[in-house]
């Protein structure tokens, strides 16, 4: 009898835990990368801050928009983009992709670069409670027009709020 009650209790708790990935759920998140957790061909200190918001248009599928700021040595890049995210069978593992436009300026009289990126991301969503999550992920931002100089990859840490 104890096994049956425990099994039923576990089933009910696990169903409620991942209701965050259901259709019509919205989320916002903020992420941070750099500090030695990412690599690009450009030398020097690097840091990236990004804010994103999304909407689950179907169970486990979300569409998102993002804005970000990337600092590498003396250059600053402002990003904006859109993409999709897929959560595997309500277990928290996710994959994402999209398109990102970046405007890079090193200040002064230097040339302004216009870059188009294909971001790829894979990570896991740890829920701290019913709404707040911690989302570590591995990312690759492939640059179409300056591949060798502007492509970067690394680890990203995000905090999300699902409502």
Name what the model sees in each region.
Residues 14-16, 38, 142:
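N-terminal processing/targeting junctions
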Residues 28-59:
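N-terminal targeting signals for Sec/Tat export/insertion, comprising classic cleavable signal peptides
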């Amino acid at each position: 009898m104890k096994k049956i009650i425990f099994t039923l209790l576990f089933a009910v708790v696990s169903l409620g835990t991942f209701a965050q990935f259901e259709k019509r759920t919205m989320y916002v998140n903020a992420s941070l990368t750099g500090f030695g957790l990412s690599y690009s061909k450009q030398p020097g200190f690097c840091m990236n801050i990004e804010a994103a918001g999304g909407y689950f248009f179907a169970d486990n599928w979300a569409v998102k928009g993002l804005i970000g700021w990337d600092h590498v040595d003396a250059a600053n890049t402002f990003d904006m983009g859109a993409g999709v995210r897929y959560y595997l069978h309500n277990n928290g593992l996710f994959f994402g992709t999209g398109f990102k436009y970046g405007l890079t300026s090193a200040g002064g009289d230097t040339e302004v670069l216009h870059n188009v990126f294909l971001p790829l991301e894979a990570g896991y969503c740890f829920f701290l409670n019913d709404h707040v999550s911690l989302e570590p992920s591995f990312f690759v931002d492939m640059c179409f027009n300056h591949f060798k100089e502007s492509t970067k990859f690394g680890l990203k840490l995000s905090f999300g709020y699902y409502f």
